[in-house]
């Protein structure tokens, strides 16, 4: 309760050869929306913003379709599931600057400023978008939320190494036998990840 709070998704994937976020946005945008809705409910936020690369027009189109479907079913908008919880999401096309992958630079860009990192503290969780509490995570993090709730935190933790829990999606590219996306348990070596891909 209290001040307006925001959920922000950093979908401005800018690393050369990276397309993990793009595959989720184009292939399963509902998983991202579901994670943001759950996070919004938990944090008491009423608005979500997806900051997406402008160079991903198909991803933006698929997100818009998924958001329209969610609104039609009552998963976005006012009084979700009769709980009194209001939550909606909008998309903001990124400005194309690599630095906007840094959370405070992304927030500056959302506010219409030049996407430059800001000094921390304050951290976005306390003073983020428009100086209000902001939860900012990437596509993969939000997309994992519903799976973790459905299967349990321990099931996610069991997929990783002792000190690095869960799994991670990587884009394999370059001088390797077979490129593409691979999801592997945390702690797995790059060599073993490539072997699993072949």
Predicted features and spans:
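Conserved oxyanion/phosphate-binding beta-strand-loop segments in alpha/beta enzyme cores
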Residues: 1-8
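Hydrophobic alpha-helical positions that pack around
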Residues: 3, 60-186
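Short connector loops/turns at beta-strand edges and beta->alpha or beta->beta junctions
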Residues: 10-16, 41-45, 175
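N-terminal catalytic cores of NTP/NDP-binding nucleotidyl/phosphoryl-transfer enzymes
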Residues: 11-13, 17-30
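Histidine-anchored nucleotide/phosphate-binding helix
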Residues: 29-42
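Short internal beta-strands
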Residues: 47-54
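Short, structural beta-strand-to-alpha-helix junction motif
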Residues: 188-193
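Conserved small/polar residues in nucleotide/adenosyl-binding loops
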Residues: 195-198
């Amino acid at each position: 309760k209290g001040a307006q709070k925001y959920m922000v998704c950093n979908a401005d994937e800018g690393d050369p050869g990276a397309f993990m976020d793009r595959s989720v946005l184009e292939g399963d945008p509902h998983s991202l929306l579901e994670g943001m809705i759950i996070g919004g409910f938990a944090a008491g936020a009423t608005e979500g913003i997806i900051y997406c690369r402008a160079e991903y027009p198909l991803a933006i189109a698929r997100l818009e379709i998924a958001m329209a479907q969610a609104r039609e079913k009552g998963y976005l908008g006012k009084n979700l599931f009769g709980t009194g919880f209001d939550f909606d999401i909008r998309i903001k096309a990124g400005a194309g600057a690599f630095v906007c992958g840094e959370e405070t630079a992304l927030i500056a860009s959302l506010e219409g400023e030049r996407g430059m990192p800001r000094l921390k503290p304050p951290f976005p969780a306390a003073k983020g978008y428009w100086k209000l509490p902001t939860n900012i995570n990437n596509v993969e993090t939000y997309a994992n939320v519903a799976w973790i709730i459905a299967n349990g935190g321990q099931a996610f933790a069991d997929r990783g190494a002792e000190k690095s829990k869960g799994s991670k999606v990587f884009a394999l590219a370059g001088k390797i036998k077979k490129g593409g996306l691979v999801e592997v348990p945390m702690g797995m070596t790059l060599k073993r990840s490539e072997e699993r891909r072949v």
